[in-house]
Amino acid sequence: MANIKSKEKRILTNEKARVRNAAMKSHVRLAIKKAKRAIEEKNENVEQLLKDAHKVINTSVSHGVFHRNNAARKSSRLDAYAFKIQNKTAN
């Protein structure tokens, strides 16, 4: 354990941030999985789930959990996956 008071405070704040970031990352992963599952099952609320996933991803950027390029890559890959699956079933 740290001997300096400011270091003890940093340890506590780092732990709070770690827990908060882990929860947000989990929320993002879950939203992406839900959207992908809906795409694969050709669910009627795919558009809403994609919109929700993009919203969660963008929120994680504003909270500082992900870098904006990382979030853009996640969103782009999700959209590309949706486009690929929808075009595959259309043919």
Curated annotation (Swiss-Prot):
GO terms for cellular component: cytosol; small ribosomal subunit. One of its GO terms (molecular function) is small ribosomal subunit rRNA binding. It comes from Mycoplasma mobile (strain ATCC 43663 / 163K / NCTC 11711). Keywords: Ribonucleoprotein, Ribosomal protein, RNA-binding, rRNA-binding. The gene is rpsT. Signal peptide: none annotated. This is Small ribosomal subunit protein bS20. Binds directly to 16S ribosomal RNA. It holds the Pfam family Ribosomal_S20p. One of its GO terms (biological process) is translation. Belongs to the bacterial ribosomal protein bS20 family. It comes from the Bacteria. NCBIfam families: S20 (TIGR00029).
